[in-house]
């Protein structure tokens, strides 16, 4: 349990009375409806949507009615799900699956079981002796809206086994279960945390700041409030109501219970849930935000990459600030309670936290010392939730009983917790114009994030924080201020003083001038005043008028864009490729359409991957074949665990092994998949032995791109890199050129990823923005007069970073990152030719 730090500053020197005037309520207003969408050939309906013109605020009326309207229509295009599947099997729904899954005893067609409907007994080839999936496995396939914290409809078909027979054993249930083909890993491991996490926040403003979610887009970085509870809407509404009358502080009590852990497969190997696949098929191939926004409403913004099944306990207790102050609770900062002595749920120490105990009893406002809060519970029986909404300060045993009863119910009624997410657009595949629709869904997600940007809100008074909740804006107030606009109360200590500036929303894009368009925003929502800080960021932004990715897709899938002539002639399905398949195959192949082949995991494509539908209605296919390039893990000895866990490993990929259950590894811990498709060194040389006394073990010295974990060096993650020199690099597998840093390239090489340096002009490197002191890179130093970072001289380098090979004036030489960065900073043209010293490349 964390050590509790209570920043409840009541005994401050000087209070500043807030003389703000009350803000008039602002009623929500709808904008006009957008035009009707194209008529859907499958549902014979069209939709239109209206956005919010004015968000309700300060207690004003909400918008009434639905944002969407739907009407019947006569389509001018057919339904894509009625087309054939070429060499693949067509389910009744129109979804296509591999013919190898037909008559295998499993219902791989999600909703209709068409693949098993007409199979004779003699044709059936059962692929496994059991078909019982792990309990609650269907939860791992749900979509998730990261802004609302709510799970949405199913996007992954968790019922399909993919023709595989992978089993997992539950020690608790003493039974074997069969894993879905979409699950990479599933582990039954019960984890019960007996240490509760207690946190105090001196205002809802502090709490919202702490729990905000930061979203990074192509244009800017934005922060939005997101409750981790599925009841986030009721939480924020209640918070707004409760702060109209007085100031509250928050005590947050949290804990989790885990019963299983899962990792889903990579997106290209996931089978989509049939309803989700249908919705993707119905999406228009021309960008229409209304249609794509409707998909986000139904299925969320992300899908689950991994997570745990279990329960999450989280209760917010509101404590009256004035009552805490009246009880002279002003020295908690100096008398922090120790984590071993302060437990509301399990026990209550009689010493060390007496001031806190007395203050909370007084602030509870009840005779029986019951502190009531708002529970946000995920998982477990619904009948236990009411018992978790309060704490009896004099009866910790009773608190424990109620919590334990709920925790036991989690085993049978778990929910997904501790989830890691991947954007939903990564699942756009196996439908016509999939690449175009994937790009459009990314655009729609950007617009969706814009709807939750606080720039739509009017300023809160006294430095309050505005957040968007549906069609309303809410104000979260700083300590000792309250009201619908935070207009009442007092600002305390260093909270008092000036008002920080806030950004307005971006303007519309300007007309194109010389191939570029611009937009702007102002720091006037509110403007800085009284010595407050100005906004951080740029006031203008420019970009190319034509999206480069969209232009590329026009060449790759011209039939997905308006043409002067509508294609009337089509090629048959592309020819099959052994050990490979067509990416985003679709169902229609008009003249001029290109398709791209790729190989199954563990194979690499040799030759030209692009085939084209010719005017003679025949496919123009070059020489190509799939060559095996992967290693497979052997059966490991008991107790040995491998990371990462994958069905196949390509040449150059690295696997690390470790021991569980108090054992230590004897032998090598890292193995490389060699060009002969064998592991080097041999994995049979690794085994687990009884762990020695950790006091006698030497601490290994890790490389700069490694970190110490469990007494051994493991690869860092790219985001763990500090400031490092920017370079352009190409992913040798996808051939995509990305902006990276020297440190990130070392980390990716450590993880077995193959990246090579390219010229600086081959990608767009981050602009060298002017930085304040405290954020200077290796090659920068602080200028005391301007309080800004300026370029170092190469001779002034202190922390040098990595040694790299740099070409300067046509000659290669080894220098540190700091020295190279100093030259680039001063405008000299340099080229990084290797992320290692020059001599290391020639050896």
From Swiss-Prot:
Question: Residues in domain MACPF?
Answer: 124-456
**UniProt keyword list:** Complement alternate pathway, Complement pathway, Cytolysis, Disease variant, Disulfide bond, EGF-like domain, Glycoprotein, Immunity, Innate immunity, Membrane, Membrane attack complex, Repeat, Secreted, Signal, Sushi, Target cell membrane, Target membrane
Q: How is it modified after translation?
A: C-, N- and O-glycosylated. O-glycosylated with core 1 or possibly core 8 glycans.
Q: Which residues form the TSP type-1 domain?
A: 27-80, 500-549
Per the UniProt record, the source organism is: Homo sapiens (Human)
Q: Which disease is it linked to?
A: Complement component 7 deficiency: A rare defect of the complement classical pathway associated with susceptibility to severe recurrent infections, predominantly by Neisseria gonorrhoeae or Neisseria meningitidis.
Q: Which residues form the LDL-receptor class A domain?
A: 83-121
Q: Where is this region: Disordered?
A: 108-143, 219-240, 516-538
Q: Which SMART domains match?
A: CCP (SM00032), FIMAC (SM00057), LDLa (SM00192), MACPF (SM00457), TSP1 (SM00209)
The UniProt regions of compositional bias labelled Basic and acidic residues, in chain numbering, are 121-132
GO CC field = extracellular exosome; extracellular region; extracellular space; membrane attack complex; plasma membrane
Where would I find the Sushi domain in this sequence? Answer: 569-628, 629-690
**Which ranges are annotated Acidic residues under compositional bias?**
108-120
The domain of life for this entry's organism is: Eukaryota
Q: Where is this region: CCP 2?
A: 616-693
**How is the activity of this chain controlled?**
Membrane attack complex (MAC) assembly is inhibited by CD59, thereby protecting self-cells from damage during complement activation. MAC assembly is also inhibited by clusterin (CLU) chaperones that inhibit polymerization of C9.
Region annotated Factor I module (FIM) 2, chain positions? 771-843
Q: Which named protein is this?
A: Complement component C7
